[in-house]
Amino acid sequence: MLINSPYIVAMTGGIGSGKSTIAKIFSELKVPIIESDIISKKIMFSEKSILNSIKNKLGINFSLNNNKYSKLVLRECIFESKSSVLFINKILHPVVKKKIKKIISNVNFPYIIWVTSLLIEENLYKYVNRILVIDVDPEIQIKRSILRDNVSKNQILNIINFQISREKRLTFAHDIINNYDYSCIRRKVFELHKYYLFKSKKYFKYDM
């Protein structure tokens, strides 16, 4: 049994880069996955006080149901201005961080994959052992996002503009997966999995 905290690999990338797809491959290898976006949405739609603060700030009204329409309406309003983004981050991220810390403390595996879009923007990279960047051509990134979310190109560009640039993100990377060929991606994930298991040995003692 593991008796100390896991080696933390942060997976980051822009919208539509394919983070969730690659995280799924890691999960097939039994690696614990923590997805900040999923946790954020669950908290936002389950904590009435947080959601009401957001609705009042943005001047919008929508269902409390955690459905796709509500998420799209909310995201469109949030990314209309920098002040809205900063406001959401200020009230939501402390709660999300607390939840993530609790999840990590209960992990019984040598390492975890923490999927977060705002790793660099929020200075969260200081809390991880290694950074895995998922990189993709901007045109593919935009097309994927439009098809997945059924939104306009302008909406996707707004979100991209609020995120750190591709070039700067890559400067933080210890490891990079170029998300183009799925068969190559799987092979790369398997290679990284072995490497992360090796790296994590420095951080663990096993209670036999």
UniProtKB/Swiss-Prot annotation:
Role noted for this protein: Catalyzes the phosphorylation of the 3'-hydroxyl group of dephosphocoenzyme A to form coenzyme A.
Catalysed reactions, as listed in the record: 3'-dephospho-CoA + ATP = ADP + CoA + H(+)
Secretion signal span: none
Domain DPCK span(s) in chain numbering: 8-208
SUPFAM superfamilies, sorted: P-loop containing nucleoside triphosphate hydrolases (SSF52540)
One GO-annotated biological process of the protein: coenzyme A biosynthetic process
GO molecular function: ATP binding; dephospho-CoA kinase activity
Its EC number(s): 2.7.1.24
Alphabetized InterPro entries for the sequence: Depp_CoAkinase, P-loop_NTPase
Enzyme class: transferase
Protein name, UniProt field: Dephospho-CoA kinase
Subcellular localization, as worded in the UniProt entry: Cytoplasm
Coarse class of the protein's main subcellular location: cytoplasm
Pathway assigned to this chain's UniProt record: Cofactor biosynthesis; coenzyme A biosynthesis; CoA from (R)-pantothenate: step 5/5
Keyword annotations of the record: ATP-binding, Coenzyme A biosynthesis, Cytoplasm, Kinase, Nucleotide-binding, Transferase
GO CC entries: cytoplasm
A Pfam family of this chain: CoaE
Binding of ATP, residues: G16, S17, G18, K19, S20, T21
PROSITE patterns: DPCK
Keyword flag Transmembrane: no
The family this protein is said to belong to: Belongs to the CoaE family.
